Amino acid sequence: MIFRKKKARRGLAQISVLHNKSVVAEQYRTIRTNIEFSSVQTNLRSILVTSSVPGEGKSFSAANLAAVFAQQQEKKVLLVDADLRKPTINQTFQVDNVTGLTNVLVGNASLSETVQKTPIDNLYVLTSGPTPPNPAELLSSKAMGDLISEIYEQFSLVIFDSPPLLAVADAQILANQTDGSVLVVLSGKTKTDTVLKAKDALEQSNAKLLGALLNKKKMKKSEHYSY
């Protein structure tokens, strides 16, 4: 779970590993370890990060998970902004979004031409690119499958930030193409039946749910770390 911070951060300030001693950074490292343990029997190459509805913090979580996985020196990680309707990764990492995922999928650019380095060692991003009229069709295309295969050849792990599950079909399409999914849940806000509907949507896609990430839980004094 990710505890609530008093002030919202913007841009690179959102990335927890840039604040190594923060509680949030340590929480994401714990989540990374839990994901690794949950998939110890499989070769986890791709993770989808999604939520039930908008506003639960999935993009924040995807960016921070990618950053903590990249901290492992042997892992070269790619974060893909597959939320083609409301992309944010370019703003988080302060990179341009002139070309990106959509350009690759329609054949106007190559993966090598669109991947961008971040200030974090071993972490690269593929932004969304221009907003297309047909996001679901692009994400379900043969070109998307081919791109994922190409990414596997160049990166140890790819993390996809997708739209919310109950808003559009995009997340279900991607969940079927990735090795596991993480469902971000906004603490104290998202209703249980909404989360269960999202879980059902993943199951209908034959997706593997790695776990749920409870975001912005109010921290009690007794829950601070002690040494």
Swiss-Prot record:
Give me the reactions it catalyses.
L-tyrosyl-[protein] + ATP = O-phospho-L-tyrosyl-[protein] + ADP + H(+)
* Lyase as UniProt keyword: no
Look up the EC number in the record and give it.
2.7.10.2
A molecular function (GO) held by this record is: non-membrane spanning protein tyrosine kinase activity
- At the top of the EC hierarchy, this enzyme's class is transferase
- Disulfide bond is among the record's keywords: no
Signal sequence extent: none
Please give the family membership noted in the entry.
Answer: Belongs to the CpsD/CapB family.
Name this polypeptide is given: Putative tyrosine-protein kinase YveL
What is the protein's species of origin? Bacillus subtilis (strain 168)
Q: What is the name of the gene encoding this protein? A: yveL
